[in-house]
């Protein structure tokens, strides 16, 4: 009998395909949801929310990780980096998932992926994030601050600022993270 499918493992696989192999998020997520259509609606919604949310807030999440980890995001092993990214997303944006569950599941996932030697690191970073998230200082001014706040690359923000000015750029950036209306076809 096969091992039960774990939603966080699926999220990790999708994030790895996108961040390490350059897959298009909408395509790979669609394929994965089609492959696992037998999962309950709640599980599929979790996979979608964590994957899309992690990607939408990637720059901010990487900033947060860099504040709480001695190893910078760019130097982390790709699997560990993406486990931590999805964990930070859950800690910051999903109140329905308890902090201890996020940490515990991330550690289990690291072990399942062959990184049992880094389980203490994963646990330590995520527990530090959970404790310190509310007191974290973000940059307040400049393009870097906008980039982190809205998770938009600085090069795009610079182009917008050059073309549209600072105020329009700020408005456009804020609109990217607004909740999108539901569309039914």
Predicted regions and their residues:
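Class I Rossmann-like S-adenosyl-L-methionine
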Residues: 1-185
């Amino acid at each position: 009998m096969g091992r039960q499918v774990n939603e966080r493992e699926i999220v990790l696989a999708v994030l790895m395909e996108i961040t390490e192999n350059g897959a298009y998020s909408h395509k790979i997520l669609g394929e994965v949801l089609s492959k696992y259509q037998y999962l309950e609606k709640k599980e599929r919604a979790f996979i979608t929310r964590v994957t899309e949310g992690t990607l939408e807030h990637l720059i901010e999440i990487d900033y947060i990780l860099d504040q709480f980890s001695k190893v910078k995001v760019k130097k982390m092993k790709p699997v560990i980096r993406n486990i931590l990214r999805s964990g930070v997303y859950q800690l910051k944006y999903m109140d329905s998932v308890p902090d201890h569950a996020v940490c515990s599941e991330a550690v289990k996932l690291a072990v399942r992926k062959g990184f049992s030697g880094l389980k203490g690191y994963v646990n330590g970073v995520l527990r530090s994030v959970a404790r310190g998230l509310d007191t974290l200082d973000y940059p307040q001014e400049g393009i870097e601050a906008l980039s982190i706040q809205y998770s938009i690359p600085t090069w795009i923000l610079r182009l917008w600022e050059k073309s549209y000015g600072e105020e329009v750029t700020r408005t456009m950036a804020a609109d990217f993270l607004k909740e999108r209306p539901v569309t039914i076809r």
